[in-house]
Amino acid sequence: MISTATKERTNIDLHNELIQKAEDLIPVLKERSESANADRRIPKETIQDMKDAGFFKILQPKQYGGFELDPHTFSEVQLRVAQGCMSTAWVLGVVGIHPFQLALYDEKAQQEVWGEDDNTLVSSSYAPMGQVTPVEGGFKFSGHWQWS
């Protein structure tokens, strides 16, 4: 009798795959780091590379297409990314931690963010210094914010 069972990918396997993807990305990030610093923004290609690698899904709940892994995996990936470009690692840290935080919210909030598109990225300012004014059809935001 031939077995048709396939080996499921474990969290350890996924952890190792993500670490390897981050290590593979280091040379590319090094090449782009000068332009990232000069332009004061991460190249769109770098954001796409991190999306494709699954870095923003590390802490995202499985029910919304994420890997639901531990913060250790996230920090290990971030440390590897930093070897290529510190600015990129900072952006990964700011944006990549929010799925963990959003997972602590009510299910309704998670559904609003990931219900239609589980690739939605979220970031916020931890130092709310602006003003929000209700306007017809939504809200108007104004003010100046420090780095998130």
Where is each model-derived feature located?
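Residue-level detector of secondary-structure boundary/capping sites
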Residues: 13, 20, 41, 68-69
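N-terminal capping segment at the start of a domain
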Residues: 25-33
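Glycine-rich flavin
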Residues: 42-52, 56-148
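Basic/polar N-terminal segments that are highly enriched at the extreme N-terminus
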Residues: 1-20, 24
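Intrinsically disordered, low-complexity segments enriched in polar/charged residues with Gly/Pro
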Residues: 15, 34, 117-120
